[in-house]
Amino acid sequence: MAFKIWQIGLHLQQQEAVAVAIVRGAKECFLQRWWRLPLENDIIKDGRIVDAQQLAKTLLPWSRELPQRHHIMLAFPASRTLQRSFPRPSMSLGEREQTAWLSGTMARELDMDPDSLRFDYSEDSLSPAYNVTAAQSKELATLLTLAERLRVHVSAITPDASALQRFLPFLPSHQQCLAWRDNEQWLWATRYSWGRKLAVGMTSAKELAAALSVDPESVAICGEGGFDPWEAVSVRQPPLPPPGGDFAIALGLALGKAY
């Protein structure tokens, strides 16, 4: 395993940063390391990095522990993204024209300069449409600058909620939605969609299911007494991570896409 590339998921939360490193064998997934790094107050606020310099200072000792051969999948808060669905245009477009059309359409929808946005899109599996996810360029630039300061290799920046999709194959057949919660929010994902709900006034899985208009029995919750994300890792050696769902997003990022 010493020569394998470490796949690392890094999840920056309001009070802490958590990270998980795995390597892949021919048929198995091996846990290498996990980290839990407390963050001072006001470094991150409502998903936005407020004090990038202090964040870099906190993460620098961690970054120095990483092997040279690594890829980091970095979480981007779903609260800082915008999602829209647009019907496919009637005319056939090449990839470049299609990207330009979606960029302009999204910018007009949000009344923003196209250059101020970065976006990704996929074809809707259930209808003739494109699902577009956008974020402000300056917020992504902040993360890339952080990576440069830490001298780490970032291979992907991914909405945090979408990382939960990686665990859906591990759920019982009657459950199609996985949710994760911290003090401020719920993150949720199904095979075809993902998102975020504020936790205020929504304290149970039943209330979340009602907000999503799904059967409560179809929702699994990450954490003790619910779904254990570590089931997705074939081989775990001590020191073992704490039980519960605190590392779910970071682990999902490290594992990569399920579909």
Swiss-Prot record:
Source organism (scientific name): Escherichia coli (strain K12)
Family matches, as SUPFAM superfamilies: Actin-like ATPase domain (SSF53067)
Biological processes per GO annotation: carbon utilization; DNA catabolic process
Record-linked InterPro entries: ATPase_NBD
Function of the molecule: Required for the use of extracellular DNA as a nutrient.
The name this protein goes by in its record: DNA utilization protein HofM
Disruption phenotype: Mutants are unable to use DNA as a sole carbon and energy source. They do not show a growth disadvantage in stationary phase growth in cocultures with wild-type.
